[in-house]
Amino acid sequence: MNHPETKEKKWRIFGALPANIVSLGWVSLFTDMSSEMIYPLLPLILTSVVGAGTTFVGLVEGIAEATASLLKLFSGWFSDRLGKRKTLVVAGYTLSAMARPLRAATTAGWHLLLVGFLDRVGKGIRTSPRDALLSDSVRREETGKAFGFQRAMGHAGAVAGPLIAFFLLTFLTAD
């Protein structure tokens, strides 16, 4: 997958990073922003709104994260075999993006468990192929810059998400 001779010719944004890297950075920013808007509130929603116990909160998070971790192993191998990393990356991000709004419609703990599971399936499908795509999109000496940009955008989203949630809850709620 790594073709150094073609990497020189790929379209680059601002002459610094290939479009794949910049696009994945922006997607990471918005994905992490949306995740971190709800993530700090999820235990509160589970215990006070849905009425779940603290053990169930741990179960929800444990199942979700275990699912993502196990799928990363499979999706990395599968993207190597398939040779179409972008397809898996798009599928994973799409599944997560479709699952997240469903949290608003949940009325029971098992609903949140299922939606969290679907969200993390998306993460598990996309993460390894995304990282391989990042690596494939740049010359070897640029991999640090590519991963650094993508991670920085993701972390910026992780910081902005809770701040936006705080603003929305503070200024746009009646209580």
Predicted regions and their residues:
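Helix-loop boundary and gating motifs at the non-cytosolic
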Residues: K9-A68
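Transmembrane alpha-helix termini and helix-breaking/packing motifs in multi-pass membrane transporters
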Residues: L44-V49, A160-D175
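Residue-level signature of mid-helix packing/kink "hotspots" within the transmembrane helices
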Residues: E65-L73, A158-V159
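Helix-to-loop junctions at the C-terminal end of transmembrane segments
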Residues: L71-G83, L169
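Structural signature of the two symmetry-related core transmembrane helices
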Residues: T87-P101
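Helix-loop junctions at membrane interfaces in 12-TM secondary transporters
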Residues: L102-V115
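Cytoplasmic helix-loop-helix junction between adjacent transmembrane helices
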Residues: V115-A156
